[in-house]
Amino acid sequence: MSENIRVSEVSDILRQQLEGIETKVQLDEIGTVLQVSDGVVRIYGLRNAEANELLEFDNGIKAIVMNLEEDNVGAVLLGPTDKIKEGFTVKRTKRIASIRVGESMLGRVIDPLGEPLDGKGLIGGELYEMPLERKAPGVIYRQPVNQPLQTGLKAVDAMIPIGRGQRELIIGDRQTGKTSIAIDTIINQRSNYEAGDPVYCIYVAIGQKGSTVASIVNTLRQYGAMDYTIVVAATAGDPAALQYFAPFAGAAIGEYFRDTGRHALVVYDDLSKQAVSYREVSLILRRPSGREAYPGDIFYLHSRLLERAAKIINQEEVAREMNDLPESLKGKVKGGGSLTALPIIETQAGDVSAYIPTNVISITDGQIFLDTDLFNQGNRPAINVGISVSRVGGNAQIKAMKKVAGTLKIDQAQYRELEAFSKFSGDMDPVTALTIDKGQKNARLLVQPQYSPMPVEKQIAILYCGIHGLLRNVPLDKVEDFEAAFLNTLALDHQADVLDVLKTGVINDEVTKAIEETAAMVAKQYS
């Protein structure tokens, strides 16, 4: 049985089907690899490539554009060089190098592109695109540093106080405890996290051994610090480009918390290795070299990175107008946030006048200088008080600490001077002997074991004893025992009327009387 096929029906069906067809044409701008060597590729054909743009090869390896020349583009590889060959095709992503940031990153170990390294699977949750390179907030979007960032270290919080939004350099030879100061500071933020006012921490490991990074992560996990910490790792085995971009990734993550009205702390460990990796990349890209073969813009590299640390103005309508704000954050900006930076620099044989150390000293708001001799003598943290300084943190120090420890720095500097002279003279007048005795006991009080940060109220109480000579009758070798017994007694008998009052930044006659009575009572056991 044959059916009559009407032409009009066929044409209607064809018309309907043709109307539903979507013809999407994606145009990719592609180039060809001319040359590849030591982590750098030269590419022909990418006429419209932008500086810092992300490029992608067919095998998934990424590169970032760093040189724009007349007939080719120089890019740094973010993967193994041996996987890229001459003649490979590479395409533009039309995206500036960036990292996706969000709350779900907390507790994770990532690379500078935001890829997880801890084997715990992909990072989920809501993520925001943050550019690695970004202009620092302008002057009108900032406010002076006025809130303390407690490190939990008596020597730092008393003599070289750090404020939220400050950049404080930690500088010293290898194996002098630079990383320990940073890790102790991160661990000390646990109390803020538990109190509901967290300081989110980003630890950036640049050019370190993988085993060292793993050990640091284990330590942070052991002390419960990974709950509010992100570790960005570019180890010694990673390409130089990844080591160069790692601090920028850390800054971008910190800016996410800062711009959403929260507080963040970023540790760059260390910028000496970043400078070396930038020198390596620049020389292979044939950029002109300057002093110590570093490129001419090495100062600008560190200044533009560290200027991103800031205390943002507490006016939301002004903060929302911030310069160079990423699209992803528009509508989510809040005022009053801060990003504090603790860059670390390694010196050679204590030479702080070398090129990179002097650059970073001049950029930052102060430095904590660690001394090898002090470290070997057992004075840890091995801070050389004479040349360590905090240029803005004093404004952020709590009033009680300022009142108690105001003269400690100069007292300790004078003690070190007198101690050096006393080695040459046999007899000393009573005043000098008393100054040296007090200085020795204060120096012993400032010694603190690793991973045992102390709350600020306990610091004030014990330093009050040292500065006001309440340890006069305590033998030098019993100072640690006195400290432990004194703080235990204070916590048992005077938690509400002394420690809780000191925590608010207040010190009055009732508080000092209770401290003096407790110290006298405990000192009797050791005199």
From Swiss-Prot:
Membrane-related topology note: Peripheral membrane protein
Its domain of life?
Answer: Bacteria
One of the record's GO molecular function terms:
ADP binding
The principal localisation class reads membrane
> Which reaction(s) does the protein catalyse, per the Swiss-Prot or TrEMBL entry?
ATP + H2O + 4 H(+)(in) = ADP + phosphate + 5 H(+)(out)
Keywords, A to Z, come to:
ATP synthesis, ATP-binding, Cell inner membrane, Cell membrane, CF(1), Hydrogen ion transport, Ion transport, Membrane, Nucleotide-binding, Translocase, Transport
What task does this protein carry out?
Produces ATP from ADP in the presence of a proton gradient across the membrane. The alpha chain is a regulatory subunit.
What's the protein here called?
ATP synthase subunit alpha
Record organism: Bacteroides fragilis (strain ATCC 25285 / DSM 2151 / CCUG 4856 / JCM 11019 / LMG 10263 / NCTC 9343 / Onslow / VPI 2553 / EN-2)
Gene expressing this chain: atpA
